[in-house]
Amino acid sequence: MASEVSASQGVPKPKIDLSKKLSELRSNRKSQPALPSRPSREPAPVTPPLSNPPDLSSHQYARPVCRILSNHDHQLFLSSSSYSLILAFIFGLSDSVRGRATTDSKDRPVSPNVSKILAVVESIRTLLDQHPSIDQGGSRFGNPAFRDLFDDVAAQSAKWHREILGIQDSTAIEEASAYLIHSLGSRDRLDYGSGHELNFMMWLLCLRQMQLYSTADFEMIVFRVYVTYMHLMRDVQSAYYLEPAGSHGVWGLDDYHFLPFLFGAAQLVEHPYITPLAIHNNVILDEEGDRYIYLDQVRWVDSVKTVKGLRWHSPMLDDISGAKNWSKIESGMKKMFVKEVLGKLPIMQHFLFGSLIPAAPGMGEADDVQTDGHDHTHSHDHAHAQHTDHFGDCCGIKVPSTVAAGAEARKRGTGLRPIPFD
C-alpha cells in the first residue's frame, strides 16, 4: 500500500487537463456555423450555339496573321466571338459523333463538297512519295526533306482551292490556304503539335464560313475528313520524324494530337461493353480500333513506342482509363481543350486571325509577316518573341521524335538505344 502511494506521489500531475480541453474544442466546433460545402467539380464547358456563316456578298478577306502578342491580347481572345465560334465548331463536331462508330458512315453518301474537301487532303498524300526522306544515319530528329513537302503543298494549295473546291476569289484562297499549309507542322523547326492540328480545324471552319458545307455534314467531316488527315499526319510523322512541339514527354496526353481523344471519347459515350479500361485490352484495340477513334489512337501510340505498356510510356492515358465512364472522359477532354489548347498563351500566340476568324477589337497588331505556327507549351509559362527563333527550336532544347525511335529500332535491330519511356 505504501509503495502504491509513493509511486503515485512520484508521477507528476499534468498542468492542463487535456480531456477538458478536448471537450471544449468539440463544443466550440458544434457552436460554430457550418462552413459552406465545397463546390462540386467544375462542369464541362457547354457547346455554344454556332452562329450563321457571314454574308459574303461584300466580304473583305484578309491574310491571316498573329494577333495575340501579350497576356492582355489572350484575355481579349478568350472573351471574344471568335473564341465562342471555335468552341461551337469543335464541340459541335464532337457532339455530332457522340455514340456513333466511324464505320457507321461507311455506306452513307457524302455530299459533293465534303468529297471535294477530302480530295484536297488526299492531294497532300500524293506528294509524300515525291519527297522521300533523307538518310540521317539513324537520327531521330526532324528530317529536312519535310521542308520540300511543305513548300510543295504551299505551291499547290491555291490550285487545289481553285480547281477542286471551286473558290475563285484569290484573297479568299489566300486566307483559307494559310491554315491548310500550316496544319502540316513547322517548316523551320521540323515539329508538329496541337497548334498545327488546330490549324487544320480552322481551315475546315473557314470552308464552313464560306458555306461549302453545313452542320448536316459534321459527322462526315469528322469520320471522313478529319480521320483522313489524322492518318496522313501519322505518315508524315513516320516519314520525316517530326519532333513533338511542346511535348510534355511521358506526362503528356499524346506527343502530337489532342482531338482523337475528344472525338473518340464522344463516340464511346454509353457504349454497351467497351469501358475506359478496355484500352488495356489488345484484343479490343485490334477488333474495335477501326470503329472508334480513341481506340485507334491508343493502338497507334502503343505501336510506335519502344517500351510497351501504357503505364510506362503514357501514364496520363493510363490514369484516365480509371474513369467511371466515357461521359467523364468526354467532359475532361472538353475541359482540357479549353485550358490546355485555347487557354495556353504559348500555343495561342501563334494562332492566325483573318476575316473569317477575326481578332477581337483592341488586340495587338502583328508585323505583316507569316509566322510559323509555334506552339510550345511549358510548365514554365513564358512568352517568346514573335519572330525570333535563335536556336531553331524553343529554348534551344530539341525533343526527338518517338515515332523515329521505334522506326529506327526496327530498321537497325537492337543496336539503337531507346529513349527512356519512348
Curated annotation (Swiss-Prot):
Isomerase as UniProt keyword: yes
Cellular component, GO annotation: cytoplasm; nucleus; protein phosphatase type 2A complex
EC identifiers of the protein: 5.2.1.8
Ranges of compositional bias, category Basic and acidic residues: 14-27
Region (Disordered), start-end ranges: 1-57
Keyword Cytoplasm: yes
Subcellular locations according to the entry: Cytoplasm
Swiss-Prot/TrEMBL GO biological process terms: mitotic spindle organization
Source species, domain of life: Eukaryota
Catalytic activity entry: [protein]-peptidylproline (omega=180) = [protein]-peptidylproline (omega=0)
Keywords assigned by UniProt, alphabetized: Cytoplasm, Isomerase, Rotamase
Example of a GO MF term: protein tyrosine phosphatase activator activity
Protein family according to the UniProt entry: Belongs to the PTPA-type PPIase family.
Free-text function comment from the UniProt entry: PPIases accelerate the folding of proteins. It catalyzes the cis-trans isomerization of proline imidic peptide bonds in oligopeptides. Acts as a regulatory subunit for PP2A-like phosphatases modulating their activity or substrate specificity, probably by inducing a conformational change in the catalytic subunit, a direct target of the PPIase. Can reactivate inactive phosphatase PP2A-phosphatase methylesterase complexes (PP2Ai) in presence of ATP and Mg(2+) by dissociating the inactive form from the complex.
Protein name per the record: Serine/threonine-protein phosphatase 2A activator 2
Originating organism: Aspergillus oryzae (strain ATCC 42149 / RIB 40)
